[in-house]
């Protein structure tokens, strides 16, 4: 029962259009019922499932829906060695070309600060990746890394070889990428809008998610989430904290020191609390 809801998201952590995992009958039901109910449908898919044949079948049932692709990085080296994604940027480009051929909306997911990357490198890379996919994506969703228990990144975090991103890095990323999304300095809905940039820090403000010193986190997270709706840089006006200088110094040092994993230290709490953090 989707009464009162305009949008239906079907995320399978893989692909709704994967016939070996998802019965074709269920795929057809999702596509047809959302179309008949007039609901905006967003499905997740890997690149290899987005063939012309599959998309022709899907659009014959539901001619208007959005496909979300977890690209993570527009960089083959990062895709292979940092996130073990299993496809290349060429695969992504080919999938997007097919989606555009059938007039299907594209939502691209990018990862901010994947493992084995410093904060400064992550900041430089993400802006390049946004620029690379902006023209071909209706929406770009940047997901800052957060620590999930039992994963490799959890082990690195416990060994102090990885720290989740600073919230200030996300703010800086938005400022640097804004002109890519809005070449004339506009906001969401303006004629100059190339794509829509969405940033939603999972566990934002917590030690296992993107965080600052603890004093300013709530305010900064709220501003980031407001920007995703408005696309207006004024959301960040007047937001400041003493920890911003620490962030600046860390970024500066990482740009001039041979520290491939970065130098970021815990921003708050003692070692025991960091290890016990949820």
Residue ranges of predicted features:
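Auxiliary Fe-S-binding modules of radical SAM enzymes
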Residues: 146-278
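Core AdoMet radical
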Residues: 1-22, 33-50, 64-92, 139-143
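Distinct, well-ordered alpha-helical segments
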Residues: 20-28, 51-59, 119-120
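Surface-exposed cleft-lining segments at the edges of enzyme active sites
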Residues: 42, 77-85, 111-121, 156-161
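Conserved C-terminal portion of the radical SAM core fold
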Residues: 90-151, 171-201
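Short catalytic/ligand-binding loop motif for oxyanion handling, primarily in non-cytosolic enzymes
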Residues: 17-19, 76-79, 115-117, 149-151, ...
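Acidic (Asp/Glu)-rich catalytic clusters
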Residues: 2-3, 31-35, 56-64, 97-101, ...
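Active-site glycine- and acidic-residue-rich loops that bind
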Residues: 48-51, 84-86, 115-128, 163-168
